[in-house]
Structure formats: structure tokens, C-alpha cells
Design a protein with these regions (language model features):
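Hydrophobic "anchor" residues on beta-strands that sit immediately upstream
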Residues: 11, 70, 203, 209, ...
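Asp-based phosphoryl-transfer active-site loop
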Residues: 10-26, 221
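Short hydrophobic/aromatic-enriched beta-strand-loop microsegments
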Residues: 68-76, 89, 132, 175-177, ...
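Short, Lys/Arg-enriched N-terminal segments with co-localized hydrophobic residues
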Residues: 1-7
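Asp-based, Mg2+/Mn2+-dependent phosphohydrolase catalytic module
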Residues: 223, 227-228, 232-265
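Active-site phosphate-binding/coordination module
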Residues: 29-126
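Conserved acidic, metal-coordinating active-site core of Asp-based
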Residues: 102, 108, 113-223, 232
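Short, structured coil segments at secondary-structure junctions
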Residues: 66-67, 75, 168-171, 223-224, ...
Length: 265
């Protein structure tokens, strides 16, 4: 079986949901085998980091629980190094305004994330009423208007598929659907954040290893990096992968690291 060169230090980036974490958004848990794998990777001398679409605030719990000090968050637009948030690049404000204006015109519920927190804001209760969402807390801010904020990090549009394809304004923004009740308007360029971290540490990008499962991981499945798709990954990601492991809840992280020789020091 093909293996990575044993003595070479690798820079390994893990997606969270569906990769490190199983159970979906409602019953998330980290498989014990994944925790063991992370410890063995550290013992082997590798650099470990998270690469998630979650906001930095929404990912901090897993970062601390699993002992990470470095993280790409916010779909590639947020960077945390040595435990300190460096920055988060917001979405293009005018693009977000156009999306929200179209939602208003079509009477589609919406919400915004205007700071790095675990709470999003909505102009009324319709977003929460529509979604019954437990992923993050939604607070009602009467008169909420994206034009009043300097920075907007994410927007959320409550709709069932295929409504999103009727929204012309979505053609100019990155977005994805991870839940049936709503879509996320959020950055989708994890490779951008990974390169920033590699530049900071002066490391060769050829030493990058990435683990992912979903459409927002496609941006980090690039040529020249070692790409591992979970068994539960979407087909498009598997087609780009160098190695396909077992499902997240079937020891996928551990099995891949063992198969690729990453535990060897």
C-alpha cells in the first residue's frame, strides 16, 4: 500500500463536521479512535490543525477539547495561530446586501452573523420558526439591516431545496447547504487559510495533508497536497482524493493515518 515517507513531518489539517466529529449537527461526538489517532500523530511529531467552515467561536470548543493550537476557520477566512485569533476576513458587504434584499423581496426568512460569536441575528422570529435550528442560537434584533454593519461573516437563508437556485444574488457569493432547512452564505476557500498558516511557519506546502468529507472541503483538495476523503464523503471529494478511508464513525481518521504510515516516527 502507498505510504507517506516515514520521517517527514507533515502538516495535517482536519475538517470538523463529518470528519473529526460524527453524529451530525444534533448529536455530535468525537470518536475515541480519532482522539487516539491525534495523540499518536503528535507523538510522531506532526503539526496538527483544524480546517473548518465553522466560525472561529463555534469551533473553539473542539479546538480546546482536542488539543489544537492552530486552526483555519470561517471557511478559510479565519486564522488562529498558537491559540490566538489572527483575523477573520468578512464577506463582501455589498454582495450580502444584495442577497438580503432579494430575500426580503421574496419573503424568505434570513439571519446574519455580524461578529465572532455563537449567536446569529435575525430581524424577527421567522428564521427560527422555519428552521427549528439547534446548530446555533438565533436572537431577534428588530430593524436588523446588513447595511448597518461594517463586517458580516455569514448569512443564513431559510428555504428548502431547490429554492436557492431561484435566487439570482447567490451567483455572486459562496454558499452551501448542510441542513435541509437553510443554506449558509459563507466563505469556501479553506486552501487560502491553510496557505497562510504554512507561510507563517515557513513550511513547504508539499507537506500538507488534508482530511474532509463535504463540498466545502473541495477547495483544500488541491494538487500537490495529500488528500484523504472520509468514507462518508461526497462522491466529488472521493474522486479527488489520494486515499479514501472508512466512515467517520467507523474509525476513519485512525484507519487512514495508520494506512498512510503517519504514526511512524
Amino acid at each position: 500500500m502507498w505510504k507517506i515517507w516515514r520521517m517527514k513531518r507533515k502538516y495535517i489539517f482536519f475538517d470538523i463536521d463529518g470528519t473529526l466529529v460524527a453524529g451530525g449537527y444534533n448529536k455530535t461526538y468525537v470518536p475515541e479512535s480519532a482522539k487516539v489517532a491525534l495523540e499518536k500523530l503528535r507523538e510522531a511529531g506532526h503539526f496538527l490543525a483544524i480546517a473548518t467552515g465553522r466560525s472561529q467561536a463555534m469551533a473553539l470548543g473542539y479546538m480546546h477539547e482536542l488539543g489544537f493550537e492552530n486552526m483555519v476557520s470561517d471557511g478559510g477566512y479565519g486564522v488562529t495561530i498558537n491559540g490566538e485569533l489572527v483575523d477573520i476576513t468578512p464577506l463582501n458587504k455589498q454582495d450580502v446586501i444584495r442577497v438580503i434584499d432579494e430575500c426580503k423581496a421574496k419573503n424568505i426568512p434570513w439571519a446574519l452573523q455580524v461578529d465572532n460569536s455563537v449567536v446569529r441575528s435575525a430581524p424577527d422570529s421567522r428564521f427560527q420558526d422555519f428552521t427549528n435550528d439547534v446548530y446555533m442560537q438565533t436572537e431577534v434584533v428588530e430593524g436588523l439591516d446588513p447595511a448597518n454593519y461594517d463586517k458580516i461573516y455569514k448569512a443564513y437563508i431559510a428555504c428548502y431545496e431547490p429554492t436557492e437556485y431561484t435566487l439570482e444574488s447567490l451567483k455572486s457569493v459562496p454558499w452551501g447547504r448542510f441542513l435541509k432547512e437553510y443554506i449558509f452564505v459563507e466563505p469556501s476557500d479553506k486552501a487560502f487559510g491553510i496557505r497562510r498558516i504554512m507561510d507563517y511557519f515557513g513550511a513547504e506546502t508539499s507537506d500538507v495533508v488534508v482530511f474532509g468529507d463535504a463540498a466545502n472541503d473541495l477547495s483544500m483538495f488541491v494538487d500537490g497536497w495529500t488528500k484523504v476523503a472520509m468514507g462518508n464523503a461526497i462522491d466529488e471529494l472521493k474522486q479527488r482524493a489520494d486515499y479514501i478511508t472508512t466512515d467517520v464513525d467507523k474509525d476513519g481518521i485512525y484507519n487512514a493515518c495508520e494506512a498512510l504510515g503517519l504514526f511512524n516516527n
